[in-house]
Structures are given as C-alpha cells and as structure tokens.
Amino acid sequence: KEIASVSFPMSLSSIFGALNRNIDSMTVVRGLKNFMSEEAAKIQYGILSGKVETLVTIPMSFNMAFATALVPAMSKATAKGDIKTVEKRIKFSILVSILIGLPCMVGMILYAKQILLLLFPNAASGEFIYQISCLGIIFILIEQTVGAALHGIGKVFIPAIALAIGGIIKLILNLSLVPINNEIFLLGGTAGAALSSVICHAVVLTIELLVLKKQLKLKFEKRKFIIKPLIAVLTMAI
C-alpha cells in the first residue's frame, strides 16, 4: 500500500507531463495550416519540437541531480520531524536551480542565432521561437526542484494536479494563438506554442511553490534569491 500510495501519484505526474509535451503534436500543425501549406507547417513544427525543445531541455540534465537527491534527503528529515533541515535543503536546492537556470536562460537568449547556426543550420529561422522557449528554462528547473521537495514531504499529488492545470491552460493558449499568422500577430503560429509552454511551466511552478510555502512557512530572502542572481546574470550578459 505504501509503495502504491507513492508510485501512483508519481505515475500521474509522468502521464500529465507526457500529455503536456504532446499537446503541440496535436495542435500545432493543424493550427498552422490555417495560413500555410501542410508541408510548411510540418517544417515549422519540426523546428519547434525537434530542435528548439531539444536545446531548451539541456539545462534540465544539470539540475536533475539536485532534484533527484532532494527526495530521499527530504523524506529522511521529514520522518525525523527535522523541519529546519527540510527548509534548509529546499532553499539550497532552489537557489542552485536559480543559479543554473538564469545563466543558461540569458546565455541561450543572447546567443540563440549562433547556437542554432552551429548545431542546426537548417533551423536558423527558429531564432525567435527559441528565444521565447528559453524564457521557460528558469521555471522548468525550479519546478523540478519544488516538485521533488513536495514528493519528499509527502504532498505527492500536488505536482500531478499542477501539471494537469498547466496542461489545460497550454491547450487553450495553443488553440487560441497557433492559428494566428505571426505576420499579423508576432506571438502567433509556433511562437504562440512556445509562449504557451512557458506560461504552462510558470503556472505549474506557481501552484507547487504556493503549496510548499504554505506547508513549511518558507521565506525566501529577495536579496539572496532574486537580487544577487539577477545582478550576476546581468553582469555576465554585459
């Protein structure tokens, strides 16, 4: 029973995560066909799913080690009732995610064209889509860590619920934005699909973070978690 109570919600999270990733495959080509040929629509979708999304997920591999290690450490501290250790480990892991995510996000946005030309020369036209997608990196990485923390403290259904809500919002935005010609509206077409993914991850993170803060009464120092990382990243960018 204990194994099932943990594995079932984790499976739900994986299912909803997979469904969210497949929303584009179900809606993008169909929406793009409103203002371009099917062949051109498939090419645009290929740039979004095959090139852009591949590059955006690279920073996740660096952050995954911290998120994975957090679950058993959190479970052990929670079982002992050591709330201070729980809070300390969560805050440290979130800070690490920020310090990984922000430089990756800014660097990829600034050098989007060069990265695409180097790795995928045929997809250089996807620069703007890539830049929009990169905005979601910081949300994805912190979402990984916060989701792991929620599993660690026993709130295993929250990530699945958050992903379901985020997926619904992404589907609505895809159906609304993708059919719009991006020559008429800059954030239409595949740019709309990229933006909907960013908003989806932002919504998921917001829900998870609100629950985590409510459960543990976490307080994040603005100077440490926002101001200093932003100053460092802006200095790097300049």
What spans do the regions from the language model cover?
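Interfacial segments at transmembrane-helix termini and the short loops linking adjacent helices
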Residues: K91, M108-I138, L187
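Transmembrane alpha-helical segments of multi-pass transport proteins
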Residues: S14, K224-I238
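Interfacial transmembrane-helix starts/ends
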Residues: I3-A4, S49, D82-L99, P103-Y111, ...
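Membrane-interface helix-loop junctions in multi-pass transport and translocation proteins
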Residues: K1, F157, G167-L205, I238
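Alpha-helical transmembrane segments
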Residues: V146-K155, E208-I226
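Membrane-interface junctions at transmembrane-helix termini in multi-pass inner-membrane proteins
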Residues: L135-I165, L175
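Alpha-helical transmembrane segments of polytopic membrane transporters and translocases
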Residues: P9, F16, A41-N63, L95-V96
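Helix-loop junctions and terminal segments of transmembrane helices
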Residues: M60-K80, K84-E87
